[in-house]
Design a protein with these regions (language model features):
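An alpha-beta-alpha
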Residues: 142-203, 225, 315
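Beta-alpha junction/loop-to-helix N-cap segments that form part of ligand/metal-binding clefts
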Residues: 25-26, 45-52, 64-136, 204-211, ...
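Short, low-complexity disordered leader/linker segments with a strong preference
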Residues: 1-32, 63, 377-380
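Segments of small-molecule ligand-sensing domains
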Residues: 296-305, 316-370
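Extracellular/periplasmic periplasmic-binding protein-like sensory domains
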Residues: 239-309, 363-364, 370-379
């Protein structure tokens, strides 16, 4: 019995060695990437579309052989657009799943909530669409794929004066939302620098549904353009009440408007917004992406899909050039990014903010459907 036990123990030990070796090989054949997005909640359309773009990029890369022979596996988490849930998702991804690369989250508040954790843990975080300037302040492991609010607000102000010829602007913004405040401040600076006058500057709080008091003041100020820097759900409500008040002037906003096409009506016509790319662009790389996205999902990709797609390819390019999965090495290469992506040519400044152009889109009716079409490009 003792001899049998000895051989049984030896056999078990050998089996465990081979099992461990098999697990190690399996794990080494993949690169796990964490993803944090709002797949439910008020801004779910951002997360759902961004994840589609990420999934498409991963499928393409894996079908082409992966990264240095390793297949990418996305481990996605839904944060519902809530910062506390972003933190929980990040902790789960980095402690349980042991990921060292995270794409997300999308809104500025949610992305900001995990930056200090990412920096402290030396986890590369790429925020696809978080435009608040402070996102990358946490340190050198934090990156983003999008332009930032000061540039976006400036684009809106320049467009209003130079393209629309506006002289009198009114602004209606969410005083509790960093994104909205950031765009508003920089729009005002650019509009006034362009010779315009801000005749009304009204605010509201997150969650408000009735904007008639502010809109009455705006109407009485007689602006020839109204700037509304907020997310599509709130913008749809404001635009409806604005038009019901008889305000027919053009309305302008930022990339938070992406999503209006499926959530608003004719009240947003004569509306223009800054965005990261135009789906109707004739650039070959854009059309290839759009064609592949439509083939996979039977719908056109919005900017969040494009930014998610670009985030994966930015990371892929850095890992390939680094020739290793060592996070510090990948970070160093990522800092030197200089390439063409769906949302434009991209390099990083010293704070890891992309230096890239923006487009202005116009909301129109086409074949009976509300859609966004390219209007103009504004360079940094």
């Amino acid at each position: 019995m003792k001899m049998l036990g000895k051989y049984a123990g030896f056999a078990l030990a050998v089996a465990l060695v081979f099992f461990a070796a098999g697990c190690s090989k399996s794990e080494s054949d993949t690169i796990n990437i964490g993803g944090i997005f709002p797949l439910s909640g008020d801004v779910a359309v951002y997360g759902v579309e961004c994840k589609k773009g990420i999934d498409l990029a991963i499928d393409e890369i894996n079908e082409a052989g992966g990264i240095n022979g390793k297949k990418i596996v996305l481990i996605g988490e839904d944060d519902e657009g809530k910062p506390d849930k972003s933190v929980n998702a990040f902790k789960k991804l980095t402690t349980k799943d042991k990921v060292k690369f995270v794409i997300g989250s999308l809104t500025s508040g949610c992305a900001q909530a995990v930056t200090t954790l990412a920096q402290a843990g030396r986890v590369i975080q790429i925020a696809p669409a978080a435009t608040s300037p402070s996102i990358t302040d946490a340190g050198d492991y934090i990156f983003r794929a999008c332009f930032i609010d000061p540039f976006q607000g400036t684009v809106g102000g320049k467009f209003a004066t130079e393209t629309l010829g506006a002289k009198r602007a009114a602004v209606l913004y969410d005083i509790q939302n960093d994104y909205s405040v950031g765009l508003e401040e920089n729009f005002v600076k650019a509009f006034e620098a362009g010779g315009g006058t801000v005749v009304a500057r009204e605010s509201y709080s997150t969650g408000d549904k009735d904007f008639n008091a502010q809109l009455t003041k705006i109407k009485n100020a007689a602006p020839d353009v109204v700037y509304i820097p907020d997310y599509y759900g709130t913008v749809a409500l404001i635009a409806r009440q604005l038009r019901m008040q008889g305000i027919t002037t053009p309305i302008v906003g930022g990339d938070g408007w992406d999503g209006l096409s499926g959530n608003a009506g004719d009240e947003v016509l004569n509306g223009f917004y800054s965005n990261h790319y135009a789906v109707d662009s004739e650039v070959p790389a854009v059309q290839k992406f759009v064609s592949s996205f439509k083939a996979k999902y039977n719908s056109a990709p919005n900017a969040f899909a494009a930014l998610g797609y670009d985030s994966v390819y930015m990371l892929r390019d850095a890992i390939v050039k680094a020739g290793t999965l060592d996070v510090a090495s990948v970070r160093s290469v990522l800092e030197q990014t200089d390439g063409d992506y769906v949302t434009g040519h991209l390099t990083f400044d010293a704070r890891h903010n992309p230096v890239k152009s923006a487009v202005m889109l116009e909301l129109v009716r086409s074949d009976g459907k509300l859609t966004s079409v390219y209007k103009t490009t504004v360079n940094p």
